[in-house]
């Protein structure tokens, strides 16, 4: 593929998540950071990860984007059938995206996460939040967070990134008030 950075996406057929999905919003920001919109792409297919993998396998999409944990089943599926290239988002590309959303941060997809990926790849990451209505009973919120904290080792077996969660990181200021039960 001749896609080596976000700057190379103009004129390429895309497979992205449904409108309003986090991955789709990040894709729109990635394009916007390069002065592009979906109108600069010949085809944009909004669908599931499974749809995106099928489009890539069939040659009907030249790139797909997703916001998920590593390793991702969809990427593993594609990599089992086709050679893949994970396009880095770093340096000026990351900085432009952070202008659009300061919550984006640099993360690394470790070498060997996917078949044929022999080097670390820098990309963007973001935090996931649990949002509760203010009127939710404080005991319910407390017990939910207590259980989440207690089962971090079990949860990290499903989503490795959860393994870094601690009461301190869970309670980090994200710019909105924490619930009374938190």
Task: Show where each model-derived region lies.
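Non-catalytic interaction surface on structured domains
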Residues: 7-10, 87-100, 107
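Structural recognition of the beta-strand scaffold that forms the well-ordered cores
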Residues: 16, 63-67, 87
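An extracytoplasmic/periplasmic, membrane-proximal ligand-sensing/linker region
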Residues: 51, 58, 68-86, 96-103, ...
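Solvent-exposed loop/turn segments at secondary-structure junctions
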Residues: 2-4, 16, 20-23, 69-72, ...
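Bilobed "Venus flytrap"/periplasmic-binding protein-like clamshell domains
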Residues: 1-58, 152-156, 172-181
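A bilobed periplasmic-binding-protein/Venus flytrap-type ligand-binding module shared by bacterial periplasmic
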Residues: 1-3, 97, 101, 115-119, ...
